[in-house]
Amino acid sequence: MIEVERVMTLDHPLTDVVGFLSDFANTEMWDPGTVTCDRVDSGPVSVGAEWRNVSVFRGHRTELLYRLARFDPDHLIFVGRNKTATSTDDLRFEDAGGRTRLIYRARIEFGRLARLATPLLKREFERLGDEVSERLPRAVDHALGTSPPRGDQPL
């Protein structure tokens, strides 16, 4: 199993950030490996909603079916599966005075054969985690509008 965690502060209110990130199709905007991510069911986003995510990792194309397993006002969990892996994206949110603190944890569990490569892949997943921590705040800003100026930023 590989686990990567990043903590980010986003310059938008918690409810807006959760609303944006609850639609897993938006991973196209912030996950560096995602090529496409399409909703496979319809209706409002709620527990049980599903997305087909196609991504490229180390030159290999892979497809996972993700399901929204938890949808709380301050906690989202998406679980993606295919024949060789289970991927869990766990997003916890905390109000930070009108801003949002996001604790993002990605966990990948490989099947038998792929499990042997886990130690070799850890560094690559850490690199992807770094990219997510750069891209996700920009995607949120783009989707929700430019972040408002704070006291420590020039106007």
What are these regions (language model features)?
Residues 17-21, 27, 51, 68, ...:
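Hydrophobic pocket/interface hotspot
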Residues 107-155:
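A conserved amphipathic terminal alpha-helix motif
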Residues 45-51:
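Short coil-to-beta transition motif at edge beta-strands of beta-rich domains
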Residues 25, 29, 59, 137-144:
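Secondary-structure transition/hinge residues
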Residues 43, 54-103, 107-110, 142:
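Hydrophobic-ligand binding "helix-grip"
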Residues 1-40, 46, 154-155:
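Hydrophobic ligand-binding cavity/cleft-lining segments
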